[in-house]
Each structure stands twice: as C-alpha cells, then as structure tokens.
Amino acid sequence: MKEKIQGDKELMINRYRRVAGLLLTVGMLLLALPLQAQKQPKEFTKWPTGSSPPEIGRRVAERLLEIPHSNFGRPGPPPFITYPEVATWYGALTFAQLSGDKDLDARLIKRFQPIFAEESNLIPVPDHVDRSVFGAVPLEIYIQTKEQKYLDLGKNSADKQWEDPTPDGLSSQTRYWIDDMYMIIILQLQAYRATGDSKYLDRAALEMTTYLDKLQQPNGLFYHAPDVPFYWGRGDGWVAAGMAEMLRSLPENHPRRAQIMESYRKMMKSLLQHQGKDGVWRQLIDHPDSWPETSSTGMFTFAMITGVKNGWLDKKTYAKAARKGWLGLITYLEPNADLRNVCQGTGKKNDLQYYLDRQRLTGDLHGQAPILWCASAFLR
C-alpha cells in the first residue's frame, strides 16, 4: 500500500513538473514576442458576419484558382505572367500559409507546376520592373517549401535586375515611376527573405531611399510622375505597400531605416486626412469629389495594418482607420469575390480629366491583390 501511495506521489510530481515546464516555455515565447504581437487591437477583432479577414482572404484566394492567367483584361492568354497576377499570387500564398490552410497552399503551388513544363513560355524575361517582379512568386514558394528549383528561378530575376547597375549602385531598371517602389522592392526583399543575403536587402533600401529623395512631396504623398502633378490613388498605393514591406524586413540598426520610417509615417499621416467617411480613398487622393477607388484603398489599408501591428503607428488612431478601410473595401466585393471599382491600368498624363475618366473594372487583379495582402497582414 505504501509503495502504491509513493508511486502515485511521484506520478503527480512528474505531472506538475511537465505542466510547469510547459507554462514556462509558453511564458518565455510570449516574452520573446513584440508587445504589439501579443495583443490584437480591439479594432482587429469582432468582425461583422462574413467580413473577417480569414473568410474574405479565402474567398479571394479561391477566386484566383478559378480563373486563367490574366492578360490585363484582354481576351486570350497572356504572353507572360503579368505583374498584377504576381501580386495576387504572392498575396494568396502568404495568406494560405498564415491562415494554416495547407490544402489551399498546396493548390496555389500546384498552379505553378506547368510553368516548369508546358507553360515555360510564360516566364517573363527579367529586363523590366514589371516583368522582373515575377520572381517574387517562386521565391515565396521556396520560402515555404525549400525546393531548390523555385529559388533558382526567383533568384535569377533578382540577380538580373542588378546585372548592370548604375554608377550609384541602382538597378539599370530604375525609371523613377512610383510603381517601382513596390515592383523592385518586393523582388529584392523576397530574395533576401529566401537567402538571408543582405545584399538584396541593401539594394532594396538604396533604391527606396533614392526614390523617396526624388519623388516624395512635402505633404508626404507622391505625384504619379515628376512631370504629372496628380496624386493618383493606386500609384501612391504601390509606394505605401512597398514601404510597409521594406520596413517589415529592415533591421532596426540598418542605416537607411530611419529615413524610410520617417517617409512612411509622413505618408500615413497625409493619407489619414484624405480617407473618405466610407473608409475608401478616392481615385485622386486629394480630390474628394473623384470616385471611390478600391485597389488604392486595399494598398493603403495594408500599409496601415502593418504599421499598427508592428508598433510603427499610433494604435488608437490607425487601427480605427485600418478597420474602416477594410470594411469599406469589402463592400465592393461581388458574391464571386471579384472586386468592383478598380481603376484600369493607367499610364501617366498631365491631364486631370484623364484620371477622373478612367474605367472602373470588376475583378481586375490590381484590386484582388491588396485584399489578400490585408488579410495576410491581419493574421501576422
């Protein structure tokens, strides 16, 4: 009897030790997390029925899998994978991973397999920012799977982009269009995230600070081009998203971080002043009478979510704006998960009416992509 009692005591002691060890481990992990990562802002919880980021993200990712490769809305297959599809595919992959949906992730990766075989003609020649950015997708798949063929394909695009740099160390693809502040940045960041090689990070940071010096206006916003004095929504959206992605990966002690952070906060402050009462930004940011545009709204919302979650922005102010942006954005979502009010592809033109008269598309991937970025950012 004494032996049984002694055995029971030892069993209980061992159980207590295991529980205590588990609690200690959990506590240490929580301490290792940034404070802002331990508690979601209340604005990022308790979503109205059908509006939560996991629900919306899954719908939009599934929609990508339903459609053929995009050709900028033109009939027939594209000559190569286009940059709006790259942005959407990247967002879908990050969403699938962050939401823990292994089946969705597997199907998104499977969608890529023909590109190594019968669809190899769709691999863009990496000789222009809009084509080079393709590499971000195989690099994301490599980050998730560690399969070498994805690294080789994606890294080739990143390396080609700096094959013949300028005397200042910039990519020869530099052209000072604000779109580049996402296109160049995300490719080089993905190469850094995949390899850990800081040369890719330094390239992205140099490129971004050079663009900031040249293009950011005193109010924190960006003209579509230096000779086109209009704050076109999606153009600025690419910048906002690019800075948010840059700051996610840039170490605190990086010499270019302070400048990028200052420019980012300056832009966010200005955007806050121009957000519509419905949560949606306008086709021309500072023209409240211009039409509500959804791709820019998604991009600005992504940048604000990322800033709040990482503690770069005042939580009380910007969490409210980000929630408002998300809920305003998804009111434009069709039952099949196509987004309405997406500005068509737009080249620069020094003509106000030109921007106001741009077509409003439904289901264009320029709009689908930032929904997935937002859903991913909420889950990080």
Model-inferred region functions:
Residues M1-R17:
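N-terminal secretory signal peptides that target proteins for export/translocation
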Residues G21-A32:
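Bacterial N-terminal signal peptides
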Residues L35-A37:
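Boundary at the C-terminal end of the N-terminal hydrophobic targeting segment
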Residues K39-V86, F95-R107, R111-P114, E118, ...:
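CBM-like carbohydrate-recognition segments
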Residues H69, G100, F116-N121, K146, ...:
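Helix-capping and short linker residues that terminate individual alpha-solenoid repeat units
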Residues I81-A92, P124-Y142, Y176-Q188, W232-L247:
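Aromatic-lined, polymer-binding surfaces characteristic
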Residues L151-Y182:
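Asp-box/WD-like beta-propeller blade repeats and closely related beta-sheet repeat scaffolds
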Residues I178-D179, L189-L284, S290-T301, L313-G347, ...:
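Extended ligand-binding clefts on enzyme/binding-domain cores
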